[in-house]
């Protein structure tokens, strides 16, 4: 029994998610459908890639991943099936596929052959038929035509100054807690740092310490009754994906706020690290 995942920008209010699931169950009654996210910002393939890339690896090989973001077919945007690390991905040729793969990671792409006319809702009217073919064991070559031509979206890669005194990055994701994740990886940070001191700068805010985990901000040497509460304090750490992350300890976007709101951070805002 293969697992089928859904990643879309449909939200949870409308009929769309339920309709897609119904169409898939009609064709694959014993399937297991897993929702990865339906709250992707509309048409944002970079946000889609961050979520799906870091989720799919935890599913068993052979899983089928449906990408319902910016999926409408047109003369310049085909529907593709990708085979990557034993996983199948179905979506539109909008730049998403190379974002899902690591640098220089081999991928196989197939243009999906379909006699279904252009539709406003391909995730419902086209993709379930492709899912069915993969689910029932057809090879990618039986489903589509191999192609090496596809749209390559530009990665938001951090930049290092020529004297290696600075790393310049951007915010690539804001999560449910308001944590703002940059594209600066731990490996890049440590390679450039070389045991030097550092200052992480965003607008008027600066940080000179990176914590290993959230609770490290608590002074456990101080008795609880006389200990200052760190709730709502800003902090830096490398998240579980090893990207530099701006956080608020025990953030609640409804009360104390998250890093994105309190620091005024938004997608693709610039951050820098100064080594000295």
Please tell me what each predicted stretch does.
Residues 1-8, 15-68, 274:
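Alpha/propeptide regions of enzymes that mature by internal proteolysis
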Residues 3, 27-30, 44-47, 60-62, ...:
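Active-site histidine-anchored catalytic micro-motif
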Residues 118-194:
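Anionic-ligand-binding alpha/beta catalytic cores of soluble enzymes and soluble regulatory domains
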Residues 2-5, 31-34, 63-66, 79-81, ...:
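Structural motif
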